[in-house]
From Swiss-Prot:
This is Mitochondrial fission protein ELM1. Coiled coil: none annotated. The keyword Chloroplast does not apply. One of its GO terms (biological process) is protein localization to organelle. Disruption phenotype: Reduced plant growth and early bolting. Elongated mitochondria and reduction of the number of mitochondria per cell. One of its GO terms (cellular component) is mitochondrial outer membrane. It comes from Arabidopsis thaliana (Mouse-ear cress). It is found in: Mitochondrion outer membrane. PANTHER family: MITOCHONDRIAL FISSION PROTEIN ELM1 (PTHR33986:SF2), OS02G0535700 PROTEIN (PTHR33986). Interacts with DRP3 and DRP3B. Keywords: Membrane, Mitochondrion, Mitochondrion outer membrane. The gene is ELM1. It comes from the Eukaryota. The keyword Membrane applies. InterPro entries: Elm1-like.
């Protein structure tokens, strides 16, 4: 079988050197700064947007990281700045107690070994430095043009907003995911449409009246808010074509149709356990006759009680391959070569990426979801992008839909806003 050939992404090049772009070279955006929080799901959205803007070869990644170990695992609800100060105090108390008590270890606070055998403290944390990024934007503006700053996640909000406040003439700051309040701190906010579900009458009826003022967001989206259907990501024509080539030898000979199953993990708004795992395996066994082969991947956060059921029910089936986490991750190969996808309802990212292929996507466990995640599932079903996985499907049946294209659409909106400033992205 020949490798899958996907069309090249449309070229945006005009063939005009940067220096001749509108406004001169200092108005051409050539680089980006990504501010991440250390979580792949958040940073993947930033990198995907950088890629869609054509800046993947010229960006810097900064991270806002929290102290870890001991009591710190219970303090992630605190603002990151206060958390670090508290960690500093606790560590000094701990060190003082060790001096006073000799080698006797504290029962409540433990020192955390790092990879090189040292201890994790404030000095070893790679920080997103507001002052450093602001100086970079200001001092290199005339030579290298404006700086796009893209951040995602709650811990990055204060960093990104401070950069815009201090260098508004030199930067364009994009915050991915709803920052909950004071959206005017950013040049653009990109967030899923279901983040505004709390404003609907249906949602209001689910919340006691005395709590409604605490639920965010509290007002409709402003003009600089870009609403997406799902999550941003790095999946595009070029990445799928590259993956199709890279995984050709492993996947080309597999019996068709190739059904890919992606399993996430329970969330606060989508709880499940072994019961859903058993429902999934029963349904897969039901449709196995119409499958050529089945390949399953589990997240590193998938609960053991879920993975045990998957391995017990399907581990010995000759048609089924379950990724064990030890071999190279086949996820991109699955997206490129899969003929249909079955995805657990909890993960907006996994579903969004599968729905960017235009291939059949079936969702299992949507009835376990509530609040915003349930609204996300509903919107996809209404658009005909996903179907519920019942176990009575003919998996050889092919159907399609206009693929989700949120990342490219968000990038187009950024280009428009830059143009309104007299700025442009490099060709």
């Amino acid at each position: 079988m020949r490798p899958i050939l996907l069309p090249d992404p449309p070229s945006l090049s005009t063939g005009v050197p940067d220096i001749f772009e509108q406004g001169g070279s200092h108005n051409v955006v050539r680089r980006a700064v990504v501010i991440g929080n250390g979580f792949p799901g958040s940073e993947n959205q930033c990198i995907g947007l950088v890629r869609a803007l054509g800046l993947s070869d010229n960006h810097l990644l900064y991270r806002v990281t929290r102290p870890k170990g001991g009591l710190n695992e219970w303090l992630h609800w605190l603002p990151v700045g206060f958390h670090k100060k508290l960690d500093f105090i606790l560590r000094h108390i701990y060190l003082y107690s060790r001096l006073m008590l000799g080698s006797k270890q504290s029962k409540y606070i433990s020192s955390v070994p790092s990879e090189n055998g040292g201890n994790v403290g404030l000095a070893s944390i790679l920080e997103a430095d507001v002052k450093g990024i602001v100086n970079l934007a200001r001092q290199t503006y005339e030579k290298d043009g404006p700086l796009i700053v893209i951040a995602c996640g709650r811990d990055t909000i204060s960093i990104a907003s401070s950069i815009r406040r201090l260098a508004s003439e030199n930067v364009f700051v994009v915050q991915i995911q709803h920052p909950r309040s004071h959206l005017n701190r950013f040049d653009m906010v990109i967030t899923p449409r279901h983040d505004y579900y709390p404003l609907t009458l249906e949602a209001q009826e689910q919340v006691p009246r005395f709590m409604r003022s605490w639920i965010t967001p509290r007002e409709p989206p402003q003009d600089h808010v870009v609403l997406t259907t799902g999550a941003l990501h790095q999946i595009d024509y070029a990445s799928l074509r590259k993956a199709a080539s890279a995984w050709h030898d492993e996947f080309a000979a597999l019996p068709k149709p190739l059904v890919v199953v992606n399993i996430g993990w329970p969330r606060s708004n989508c709880r499940y356990g072994a019961d859903l795992a058993k429902q999934l395996t029963d349904s897969l066994l039901n449709v196995l006759a119409t499958c050529g082969s089945v390949r399953i991947t589990l997240s590193y956060k998938t609960p053991a009680k879920v993975s045990r059921v998957i391995f017990k029910e399907l581990g010995d089936n000759p048609k089924v391959y379950i990724w064990n986490g030890q071999e190279p991750n086949p996820y991109m190969g699955h997206l490129a070569w899969g003929d249909a996808f079955v995805v657990t309802a909890d993960s907006v990212s996994l579903i969004s990426e599968a729905c960017s292929t235009g291939k059949p996507v079936y969702v299992v466990g949507a009835d376990h979801c509530k609040w915003k995640i349930a609204e996300f599932q509903k919107s996809l079903r209404e658009r005909g992008v996903v179907r519920s996985f019942t176990g009575f499907e003919d998996m050889s049946e092919s159907w399609s839909y206009p693929p989700l294209n949120d990342t490219a659409e968000a990038a187009t909106r950024i280009r428009r806003e830059l143009a309104a400033r007299g700025w442009s992205l490099r060709s």
